[in-house]
């Protein structure tokens, strides 16, 4: 049995699970990257991430050209902007820890997997937006897990690097029309208001968390975020049905962040 023999929903579920598995894998790969940095020097991670990114995108481009439809030329602006985002992410990493540059490539890959999962239900710009947002939110989970790890630290800067990797990758995959079909998509104002609510809720959680290092994170910082799914469940009929899968995915990724203030209350766990 291959993944193609599964139903679209089963394929999407498998892809989502792979995204979720990759986050703790990424968190626990840091000792490997650190060891390689010790052996080969910091210059190794100054050079390696851009090389991997170029090779990965080049490989995807080659595959795209092999199976390209004449009616779907490459969107050079989208690809160029995506590459720019990725290189900004590479430059934005802490210069004292060049090993962290690998996060750009990691989250570009997660965005690609999320794009495949969502492509069964979304198309066009909504597919770009929701897959990139999903990857970026998993990057936030990554940082909270780092904060709970005894040998890591929570940081907004690294979160921004993850975001740039996800959105940069998303723009590249969009420009290459990967897992995409030409179908019209509409977005209502209620969808935009709700997504804005989610964004504010996430910011109200992640920004104050910086000041709780070594402390128990107060649950109040997650209250605005927890209110969002309640509103969605009550008024879900007025949301745009065509993008409901994207809204549900990013809502789940965002609202599940509320578990971290609770985890900081467990004995033996120090958030830093």
PLM feature spans:
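Bulky hydrophobic segments
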Residues: 1-141, 147, 156, 170-171, ...
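Pore- or pathway-lining transmembrane helices of multi-pass membrane proteins that form conduits
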Residues: 160-164
């Amino acid at each position: 049995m291959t993944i193609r023999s599964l139903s679209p929903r089963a394929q999407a579920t498998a892809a989502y699970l792979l995204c979720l598995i990759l986050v703790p894998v990424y968190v626990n790969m840091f000792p490997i990257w650190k060891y390689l940095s010790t052996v080969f020097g910091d210059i190794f991670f100054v050079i390696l991430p851009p090389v991997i990114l170029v090779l990965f995108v080049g490989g995807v481009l080659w595959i795209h050209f092999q199976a390209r439809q004449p009616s779907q030329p490459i969107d050079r602006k989208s690809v160029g902007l995506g590459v720019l985002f990725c290189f900004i992410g590479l430059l934005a990493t802490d210069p004292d820890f060049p090993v962290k540059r690998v996060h750009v490539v990691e989250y570009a890959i997660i965005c690609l997997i999320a794009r495949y999962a969502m492509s069964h239900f979304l198309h066009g710009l909504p597919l770009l937006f929701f897959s990139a947002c999903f990857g970026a939110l998993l990057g936030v989970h990554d940082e909270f897990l780092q904060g709970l790890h005894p040998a890591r630290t929570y940081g907004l800067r690294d979160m921004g690097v993850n975001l740039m990797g996800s959105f940069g990758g998303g723009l590249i995959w969009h420009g290459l029309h990967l897992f995409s079909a030409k179908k019209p998509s509409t977005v209502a104002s209620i969808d935009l208001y709700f997504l804005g609510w989610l964004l504010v809720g996430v910011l109200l959680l992640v920004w104050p968390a910086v000041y709780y290092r070594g402390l128990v994170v107060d649950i109040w910082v997650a209250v605005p975020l927890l209110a969002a799914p309640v509103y969605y469940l009550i008024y879900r009929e007025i949301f745009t049905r065509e993008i409901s899968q994207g809204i549900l995915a990013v809502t789940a990724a965002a609202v599940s962040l509320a578990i971290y203030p609770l985890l900081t209350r467990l004995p033996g766990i120090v958030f830093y």
